[in-house]
Swiss-Prot record:
Zn(2+) binds at residues 418, 421, 436, 442. Belongs to the NAD-dependent DNA ligase family. LigA subfamily. One of its GO terms (cellular component) is cytosol. Coiled coil: none annotated. The gene is ligA. This is DNA ligase. NCBIfam families: dnlj, PRK07956.1. InterPro entries: BRCT_dom, BRCT_dom_sf, DisA/LigA_HHH, DNA_ligase, DNA_ligase_AS, DNAligase_adenylation, DNAligase_N, NA-bd_OB-fold. Its cofactor is Mg(2+); Mn(2+). It catalyses: NAD(+) + (deoxyribonucleotide)n-3'-hydroxyl + 5'-phospho-(deoxyribonucleotide)m = (deoxyribonucleotide)n+m + AMP + beta-nicotinamide D-nucleotide. The keyword ATP-binding does not apply. It comes from Xanthomonas oryzae pv. oryzae (strain KACC10331 / KXO85). Its EC number is 6.5.1.2.
Length: 841
């Protein structure tokens, strides 16, 4: 495999992961859906052609996506997967051909076809025919409980019709805002001087995320059902439609209608690729006249048995496809091209545009992706460009209208210095991305590092928003992430006041007002004496806020009854809570390049100890399944940096505690062999076969170091391989790495238990269900602790449930458990059990 292929796959993963982070975690996307889909498809094609490129943490193996913190999180009983996308007829025909070959049927394939609604995916749960819960899609595995807001949507049935209603039924569908409702809402909002909704899609999503359901009730929302999740008929749970209910997708939709769910009247059943493409054409022509927004059509194999036979890939069903419409476009003028710096230093060019309406939204910025894209398009300041909101969401510059270019424009060049910190902007050979070389000395990178560190899937510091992170970094109060754990309530209050003041003069006047209004009236004359009353005209530097703080401005002990402090106290409490974490969260929070959640989880499971991981030579990381050379080298590079080790030391010194440390997995024992180490060192020409041959003949790295190629040749190793290995070992850095890796390999073998000694948890093989609200810990935290003891935590009660943990306001699950004779635990018993087995924190 060519090095260029490896590098391209690495670049694609980096760009996709960055796009996922900005879209789901930061809510600040920088590339369009169309560009994302293009990158994703290219990566899939590379991984299909070169399977050895596939890793467990590849973006192709997971569903993107993030859950907001305002609502209770709920894990879906069956994941809400996304769909593969098609953008042309060839991809649609290939989709049909794949199913045809797999099914081996001589009859034309039938497909259920429907519009791709542009709203918010939702899962509705019914128990004994009554609505009990509505959960957003979230990241596909975990969503937000928006039940009270769902209840306000009139098209959602609260009680199902008919006599054959399942005991448990999960219905998947889309909440959307009709176009006429959107228009009427904005008319009323404009008349009242209120903020307008940007588009129906944003209106639907924002309405469901209102904490006050009375606000949601005022929004014109509607719902279409298009599928099902979990079904329980009598005592049997199904993760697919049972034959007794329906044998085809279209029949299942008809049954949903009979139960009272709204199903689009545009759903049809067609045959073959010709039928699919004809439907796509018809819906595309009718699109502008529809009462709701759509961004494509969806094709699903109608036969449910065929769906089961086709199965799933990790990200999507093989039996369904989303055929998307072309993005909407408008022309405007480029007023400037600026650089944004991301967490890893990536320098992304952004076009500042003359405001233009595209698909119902005013667009002022558009991504240019990278310097190569700018060069390809030859975008210049002053150009008229075509702006596309790919997927009808994120704007990008799609093309330049060359014949409208004004005279004397100049080609754009990537700046040589970072606009934030002044460090050199560099690009590694073969890379498309330019990066600021300042690393964490660059405030922009520090800000992104902080945002990642406190995010929900990392250290989960609730309440620390993006704007306040900017204040913390700009002020110099925090230099590294460990400084978060030194913050005080007084510092936060001081920062908030300085950050919200329009000028130092306004700040000082506010200070005087606070002092004069409390028990400090005697200081008023002093303030007047030093010129506070006269402040107002003198020019001050833009850095005045940070300068005041760096100068050691004393904390103001103002009348706390007149200053809101609860937010600061809550934030400090959230920071304190985050001190107790898990190894996988801690590793993910460090922001190591290429180390996503799944890789962090694998490292935790296989090695179990931070001190071991942070001092491990990079080749040994490759013994973990699905960690390849690129990720292993990235880990090694990160831990080789003294600054990163120092940052970890600071976090531990400030009492960040990792509570799930354990010995290395015994499964590693069979992997820690000299042959594997020789292979993992990536020595040119040393293939797995040659590595095994050399390991058998020599037994250790030391035996290879000083003999040159001759002993290798005598042992039957080909001359070219022997010379390559001997030459590689002559490089001091390589020799040091090999010796260090050999020693660590031996140490690992000595510290791990034998396979038979592997500990089992007290709840191994048992299924547990949690219901209601727990006072001492969240349900997610309880779930993690129970899983650490071997339990499988399920979402519904059955005869196989070992026990049910019932918190406050436990509902139908408690009733079901009692009727089945399942053991009931209250929170006190749970906490006692966790404490007994070392899971109290």
């Amino acid at each position: 495999m060519e090095q260029g292929v490896i590098e391209r796959a690495r670049e694609l993963r980096r760009r996709i992961e960055n796009a996922d982070h900005r879209y789901y975690d930061l809510a600040d996307p920088e590339i369009t859906d169309a560009q994302y889909d293009q990158l994703f498809r290219e990566l899939q094609e590379l991984e299909q052609k070169y399977p050895e490129l596939v890793t467990a943490d590849s973006p192709s193996m997971r569903v993107g996506g993030a859950v907001r913190k305002s609502f209770v999180k709920v894990r879906h009983s069956i994941p809400m997967l996304s769909l593969a996308n098609a953008f042309d007829e060839v991809e649609v025909k290939n989709f049909v051909d794949r199913i045809f070959r797999r099914m081996g049927s001589s009859n034309p394939l039938e497909f259920s076809v429907e519009p791709k609604f542009d709203g918010l995916a939702i899962s509705l749960r019914y128990e004994l025919g009554k609505f009990v819960q509505g959960v957003t899609r979230g990241d596909g595995d975990v969503g937000e409980d928006v039940s009270e807001n769902i209840r306000t949507i009139r098209s959602v049935p609260l009680k199902l019709k008919g006599n054959n209603v399942p005991a448990i039924l999960e219905v998947r569908g889309e909440v959307y805002m009709p176009r006429d409702g959107f228009s009427e809402f904005n008319k009323r909002a404009m008349a009242r001087g209120e903020k307008l909704l940007a588009n129906p899609r944003n209106g639907a999503a924002g309405s469901l995320r209102q904490l006050d359901s009375r606000i949601s009730a005022q929004r014109p929302l509607s719902f279409f059902a298009y599928g099902v999740g979990l079904i329980q008929v009598e005592q049997d749970l199904f993760e697919e439609i049972p034959q007794s209910i329906a044998s085809t997708h279209s029949a299942m939709l008809a049954q949903l209608r009979a139960w009272g769910f709204p199903v689009s009247s545009l759903v049809e059943v067609v045959q073959g690729s010709d039928g699919l493409l004809a439907y796509y054409q018809r819906i595309g022509e009718a699109r502008d006249g529809l009462p709701f927004d759509i961004d494509g059509v969806v094709y699903k194999l109608d036969d449910l048995a065929g769906q089961r036979e086709m199965g799933f890939v990790s990200r999507a069903p093989r039996w369904a496809l989303a055929h998307k419409f072309p993005a909407q476009e408008q022309s405007t003028t480029v007023e400037a091209i600026e650089i944004q710096i991301g967490r890893t230093g990536a320098a992304t060019p952004v076009a500042r545009l003359k405001p233009v309406h595209v698909a119902g939204v005013i667009v002022t910025n558009a991504t240019l992706h990278n310097a190569d894209q700018i060069a390809r398009l030859d975008v210049r300041v002053g150009d008229t460009v075509i702006v596309r909101r790919a997927g009808d969401v994120i704007p990008e510059v799609a093309a330049v209208v060359a014949d409208q270019r004004p005279p004397a424009t100049q080609s754009w060049q990537m700046p040589t210095q970072c606009p934030v910190c002044g460090s050199e902007i560099v690009r590694e050979e073969g890379q498309a991305v330019w990066r600021c070389s300042g690393e964490l000395t660059c405030p922009a990178q520090r800000k992104e590092a902080f945002r990642h560190f406190v995010s929900r899937r990392a250290m989960d510091v609730d309440g620390l928003g993006e704007k306040f992170i900017e204040v913390l970094v700009d002020s110099g109060v925090v230099q590294g992430v460990a400084d978060l754990y030194l913050l005080t309530v007084d510092q936060l209050l001081q920062l908030r006041m300085i950050s919200t003041a329009e000028s130092p003069h306004a700040f000082l006047r506010e200070a005087r007002e606070h002092l004069a209004s409390g028990a400090y009236a005697q200081l008023e004359a002093t303030l007047v004496g030093i010129g506070v009353d006269l402040a107002g005209e003198r020019e001050v530097p833009q850095t005045w806020q940070a300068d005041l703080l760096r100068a050691g401005l004393p904390t103001f002990d103002w009348n706390r009854k007149k200053i809101a402090t609860k937010w600061a106290e809550n934030l400090i409490e959230a920071i304190e809570t985050s001190r107790d974490t898990t190894l996988e969260r801690f590793l993910f929070a460090l922001g190591i390049e290429h180390v996503g959640e799944s890789t962090a989880k694998a490292l935790s499971a296989w090695f179990g100890d931070l001190d071991l991981i942070r001092h491990l030579p990079w080749p040994l990381f490759k013994r973990v399944p699905d960690i390849g050379g690129e990720v292993a080298r990235s880990l090694g590079h990160f831990f080789d940096q003294p600054g990163n080790q120092k940052a970890i030391d600071h976090l531990l010194a400030r009492k960040v505690r990792i509570g799930d440390t354990h010995p290395p997995s015994p499964k590693l024992r069979g992997e820690l062999r000299l042959a594997n180490l020789l292979e993992d060192l990536e020595i040119p020409k040393v293939t797995p076969i040659r590595a095994a041959q050399i390991a058998t003949a020599f037994g250790s790295i030391d035996a290879l170091r000083n003999g040159g190629p001759e002993p290798l040749v005598e042992a039957g190793v080909p001359q070219s391989v022997a010379e390559s290995l001997a030459t590689w070992l002559l490089v001091p850095a390589n020799d040091t790495l090999a010796v260090k890796a050999q020693k660590k390999l031996s140490a690992l073998l000595a510290m791990m238990p034998e396979a038979g000694e592997e500990k089992t948890g007290p709840l191994d093989g048992q299924t547990v269900v949690i219901t209601g609200t727990l006072a001492a810990l969240t349900r997610d935290a309880a779930k993690q602790r129970l899983e650490a003891l071997g339990a499988k935590v399920a979402g519904s009660v059955s005869k196989k449930t070992a026990f049910l943990v019932a918190g406050e306001e436990a509902g139908s699950k408690l009733d079901k458990a009692q009727s089945l004779g399942v053991e009931i635990w209250d929170e006190a018993r749970l906490l006692a059990f966790l404490g007994e087995h070392g899971q109290q924190r």
